[in-house]
C-alpha cells in the first residue's frame, strides 16, 4: 500500500481501518447470523 507513504498519520489510519475490517470479518466468520442482521 503506497498510501502509507503519503503522511505520518495516514498509515495509522489505514491500519485502524484494516483492524476494524478484520474484526468485522471475524465476527461474520464465527457468527454470520449477527453479521447479516445489521
From Swiss-Prot:
Entry's localization field: Secreted
Is Plastid given among the entry's keywords? no
Name its GO BP terms in alphabetical order: neuropeptide signaling pathway
On this chain, the residues bearing Pyrrolidone carboxylic acid are 22
- Top-rank taxon, per record: Eukaryota
Q: Which UniProt keywords apply?
A: Cleavage on pair of basic residues, Neuropeptide, Pyrrolidone carboxylic acid, Secreted
> Which Gene Ontology cellular component terms are annotated?
extracellular region
Propeptide positions in the record are: 1-19
User: In which tissues or organs does this protein occur?
Assistant: In its non-pyroglutamate form, expressed in antennal lobe (AL), corpora cardiaca (CC), corpora allata (CA) and gnathal ganglion (GNG) with expression in AL detected in most animals and expression in CC, CA and GNG detected in few animals (at protein level). In its pyroglutamate form, expressed in antennal lobe (AL), corpora cardiaca (CC) and corpora allata (CA) with expression detected in few animals (at protein level). Not expressed in GNG (protein level).
Instruction: Please state which protein family the record places this protein in.
Output: Belongs to the allatostatin family.
Outline what the protein does.
Strongly inhibits juvenile hormone biosynthesis.
Name it: Allatostatin-C
Species this protein is from: Agrotis ipsilon
